[in-house]
Amino acid sequence: MKTIKIILLLFCIILGINAKAQTVGYTYKALAAEGCNMKYSVAKQDTMYSIVATVRSDRMNFLSEPTMKIRTFSGKYLELKGTVIGNGSQSAGIISGNVVIPVTEISSTAQFWITPQQFEILNEGVAKIRLSMTPMNHERTFKKDKIGKKLYRFYQKEKQKDENF
């Protein structure tokens, strides 16, 4: 009974941590490949805002100077320049019968600079996004907005932190 309480407590703590996280993301599988998991967040350094994008995949990495191209549902176009701020990998193995199958996951993070005026455009909703990566670009088209309005809300929260200091 005590172990059930501990497990339940840990589950609630983990759920609470995930609820406080200021990220928005999606999983994308193109052409039956392994796909990737994308996460986006908003950060502020001094007076500059940026969108921080992280990809977790079996092979995709950001280029050294990546670009993020965004088309909104109203047809407006944004092109953001960025820099890579981190690359990493994790390896594990899956046991199938008496064979160990190696599994490697690559994580790459890039930071894209954005102005408050561009955040206003993002609030219209993101219809399409393209990120320059290697070995191939990541491109996703949305039928409904999944990231635009949320990124705008994250921007508003970052802006309020300065105003309420």
Question: PLM features: residue spans?
Answer:
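Bacterial Sec-dependent N-terminal signal peptides
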Residues: M1-G25
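Short acidic/polar mixed-charge low-complexity motifs
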Residues: C36, S74-K76, M136-H138
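Ser/Thr- (and often Asn-) enriched beta-sheet segments in non-cytosolic proteins
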Residues: S41, V52, T67-K69, E79, ...
